[in-house]
Amino acid sequence: MSSKLVLVLNCGSSSLKFAIIDAVNGEEYLSGLAECFHLPEARIKWKMDGNKQEAALGAGAAHSEALNFIVNTILAQKPELSAQLTAIGHRIVHGGEKYTSSVVIDESVIQGIKDAASFAPLHNPAHLIGIEEALKSFPQLKDKNVAVFDTAFHQTMPEESYLYALPYNLYKEHGIRRYGAHGTSHFYVTQEAAKMLNKPVEELNIITCHLGNGGSVSAIRNGKCVDTSMGLTPLEGLVMGTRSGDIDPAIIFHLHDTLGMSVDAINKLLTKESGLLGLTEVTSDCRYVEDNYATKEDAKRAMDVYCHRLAKYIGAYTALMDGRLDAVVFTGGIGENAAMVRELSLGKLGVLGFEVDHERNLAARFGKSGFINKEGTRPAVVIPTNEELVIAQDASRLTA
């Protein structure tokens, strides 16, 4: 077994994803999910040595109970795993402007994560709980905890990409600007695309589409992010599972003034009741939309709006490529599996030289990477993301 084992933690407001990964070869020794925190059905599921197990955490359990269970129950089954841990990597959704790369966690970093919490009110406070609990559970690794920021990869954006056309003082005094998200995923697939296209990363011009329950598109020029669709928060941009993405901001005033909705109700509407769920009025699941596209009006409506928005972003970002677009990359749960989304979206972009090969497109699903374009047309690639590996590698590198 390698001596570069890293515990990767991804704390959400009501869940905790965890894995132990070899940062050298990417092998996963443990993976799992604790979920339904603060509810009677709080539970934990994990896979170790190919065996899947699950257990109840007890009513109302949360991050502390989950980490206790990982340390005292799961890792107790295999003490050599615990003994070989060299670092802990924490996924942090928002690092504000301060963090342009991953950092070893100390008091100032904890304060920085707190300072950015207003931009990620559901996520950052949960990350801080995860850090606090990890420091308690693994005292021997107290100076080996690393924060990996979802916003860091986008910090290379130029001013014209990240500024909103609002009074400049709002940016200077309050940090209101575009930050983006999914940066770790966009970074990973950029590195992988360079290998598949046989080009040095620093010469790579691509558009990366991370499509999951949340979704974002990034423009990568010479290997660096120059624009991305998510904004101050992950609400801007594409149509998502339950998020609206781009809307006319005046809709908010209309909902408030004319329909009498409260600010909290509007926030809930835009973040939890819109997107595919809002358009279908049934589900946020893209599989339903794909499976029922030909037979159900709600599914067709949702898919058409989704792909229209995605194609618009890809088209717009070609303008930032300095005249050379090497490929479009699809990743994330929808990007990797929804062949119809890829085909319909790229079908709108024939003017840019995209032509999807139907068979190749169907083959590149369920964890398989590959080119999905017809021979001789502009490359379109599917690359399964691996954010956990990036987090493990950064944690290992910074604590070596």
From Swiss-Prot:
Disruption phenotype: Not essential it can be deleted. It catalyses: acetate + ATP = acetyl phosphate + ADP. It is an enzyme of class 2 (transferase). Induction: Expressed during exponential phase, decreases as cells enter stationary phase at pH 7.0. Expression is inhibited at pH 6.0. Part of the ackA-pta operon. It is found in: Cytoplasm. Catalyzes the formation of acetyl phosphate from acetate and ATP. Can also catalyze the reverse reaction. During anaerobic growth of the organism, this enzyme is also involved in the synthesis of most of the ATP formed catabolically. The main pathway for acetate production during exponential phase. This is Acetate kinase. It comes from Escherichia coli (strain K12).
